[in-house]
Amino acid sequence: SPALDERKPIIPQILEEDKLIHYPYESIRPFLQLLHEAACDPDVVSIKMTLYRLANHSKVVDALVEAAENGKQVDVLVELKARFDEENNIEWSRLLERAGCHVVYGIEGLKVHSKLCLITRKTKEGISFITQIGTGNYNEKTSRLYTDLSFLTASKEIGLEATEVFRALDQGETVDSVKNLLVAPHCLQNRLLNRIDGEIKAAARGEGGYIGIKINSLTDKVLINKLIEASQAGVYIDMVVRGICCLRAGVPDETENIHIISIVGRYLEHSRIYIFGQGERARYYIGSADWMTRSTLRRVEIAAPVTAPALKARLQHIFDTMLADNCNARVQQPDGSYVRRMPGADAVDCQAQFYEEAYQANVHSSLK
């Protein structure tokens, strides 16, 4: 992965600066290497992780078992209600427990769909954290087939908030509110509504309100109504929604400022990106939540702010490239139908372009 040099230890690279991995164009190997390093690092005291869907021969589980055997505290929340993976997850849970991991089996009434990993280190300088927040599962197989984003940070603030999230999960609860992370079911939908309101106010000030959203599905009525309100207030909204979409774009006086495309290509589009504002004002998030009522109110989901300038620019580039796609994109019409874009002289296949960019970055880094 160009974001992380696999030839060097991974932990110091994340301590130096935030990292973003884009699957399947970049490999999951650096993340697996990170887990293995954490399992063997004498400074690491604990590894905490939420598991939803795992590969059949999971290197993630191997690393967690190794960590427990090395005397680390390993806390794992395994979601037994993951559809089609219930049996697998029971087996993995037993294996982890036998190795000495502390396993929690989901939360009553909620499905834990968040992708969160927290590594806690204790050195002479004090406690430090490495937190990973993703849009997709810790699964080596699907990381080669689905497009997903994995954000890695050594931010103490994010690490402390992730600690709060795990503390609540361990007690069968969910956090009410933390400052930076958006955590469903209590502080994701309301934060998104606040961000949309922020863009409505920006439009009223003449600052050009803007929202960019990439998700799998859009069914949350409360968020849909707020997007319609934003469109009517003059906020321009770009959306990349692969699957179910209960909002019609381009309806005069209602959603004429909303533009929706669906991208269906070689890889399954699975990443979630939320952008609020433009230029210096823009705020970026990546996370596990679609804008569906089941995600915002009936699941534990987590989205994280991405604040490093280089990573914000990268997310904007990813989003812009998708909007420009004219090979895999279908554009939603006001009647709810979709019309396939036809590539002219300048064909843009966003997935092929991301693959090429990752390849070139890899070649460049291997020459260093």
Language-model segments: which ranges?
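Cofactor-pocket helix-loop regions in the catalytic cores of large enzyme subunits
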Residues: 216
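N-terminal localization/anchoring segments of enzymes in phospholipid and broader phosphate metabolism
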Residues: 1-211, 229-233, 245-368
